[in-house]
């Protein structure tokens, strides 16, 4: 096996974004959050890399319109998807679901030898995505 073959088999496959992940869920199909950012942090900046297969839950803008947001990372630790359980106080731009809940899937491209990620246009939550973040949507429902 040449060095290039070895590298491609054992190294490169672990450092490229795949979008594939095995996020843990409970019996009801709700995602198990691996890291929760405390509410005292006023503005959490989402990391583009984290622990592989992890889910980070953080809060949007504090106050009466607070929402839970979730960041999902793929099997190699790249940001794969974000689910926002509200409209970020911008209902005209987020006409999704009951509360403006929506998903942003990430696309990764290689430029000049580095992986660059950007979110694709926001989308309505699928039933599977809605089930994953059930707790965040219920939290939003209690604010009425």
Q: What label would you give each PLM region?
A:
Residues 3-144:
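Catalytic toxin/effector domains delivered as secreted proteins or via bacterial secretion systems
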């Amino acid at each position: 096996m040449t060095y290039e073959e070895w590298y491609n088999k054992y190294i490169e496959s672990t450092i490229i974004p795949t979008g594939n992940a095995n996020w843990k869920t409970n019996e009801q199909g709700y995602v198990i959050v691996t890291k929760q950012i405390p509410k005292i942090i006023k503005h959490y900046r989402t990391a583009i890399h984290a622990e592989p297969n992890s889910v980070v839950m953080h809060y949007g803008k504090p106050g009466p319109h607070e929402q839970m947001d979730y960041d999902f990372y793929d099997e190699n630790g790249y940001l794969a998807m974000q689910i926002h359980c509200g409209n970020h106080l911008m209902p005209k731009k987020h006409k999704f679901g009951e509360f403006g809940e929506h998903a942003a899937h990430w696309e990764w491209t290689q430029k000049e030898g580095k992986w660059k990620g950007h979110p694709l246009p926001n989308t309505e939550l699928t039933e599977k995505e809605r089930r994953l973040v059930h707790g965040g949507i219920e939290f939003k429902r209690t604010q009425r």
